[in-house]
């Protein structure tokens, strides 16, 4: 039994140096030992330490021989051996997740700053609303607004320096002043339109009343009795080109319409052609 264990241990010990000699004789081969030989070497050293720590008995020798015989040299090493090596390498997914987590942390850190900036702006607006101007400042601003409703940057800076204000405060005052002026002008326009609408409504009522009266007068029979002849109708200025035909001479009209009397027993009349005859003379 001791011979078998020594022989097995010797063969395991000689195989590893032979591998090293072959590597030295062949420089083209990589000097780094393969994972299988390295794992085999670790198993052999672990087995030797295990057998040395176990007491020298028949049962322990049988268990050791069974354990050693169960080792397959040609079997590829298990993935557990590379657990330490794989633990040091991070996967792309983990890298992406870690970078995403860091980015979210940075965004969370920057959010309070943004909210503080917004609150500062709101506070600034409140401070601008609380601005109180003196009478002199208001008078100067009003006079300047009458001359120029808008200011360029240079005029704004000069006016702010003159009044002891900031340029932003002057700009806000002019914006509010323009808004008030526009509102007043809108109110004036609305009042003017309201009056025009009232006048048009009143005129419409008057015209509707006249139309109703004319319709009632047209339907009554007295309208035709008191109607004036067409010759006495007055023409509107737009219809002056339609003129009434001039009246004909009274003599020509009477001669044209005069009828001759017919008398069967009247004496003979002279014909206009100079011939005379006896009307209804009895024959002899």
Curated annotation (Swiss-Prot):
InterPro entries, alphabetized: HD, HD-ZIP_Homeobox_LZ_Class_II, HD-ZIP_N, Homeobox_CS, Homeodomain-like_sf, HTH_motif, Leu_zip_homeo
Protein name: Homeobox-leucine zipper protein HAT4
Alphabetical list of PROSITE patterns matching this protein: HOMEOBOX_1, HOMEOBOX_2
Low complexity: bias regions: 89-100
Quaternary data: Interacts with DNA as homodimer.
Polar residues bias locations: 48-59
A GO cellular component annotation in the UniProt record: nucleus
Start and end residues of each stretch annotated as Disordered: 48-132
Location of the region described as Leucine-zipper in the Swiss-Prot/TrEMBL record: 193-214
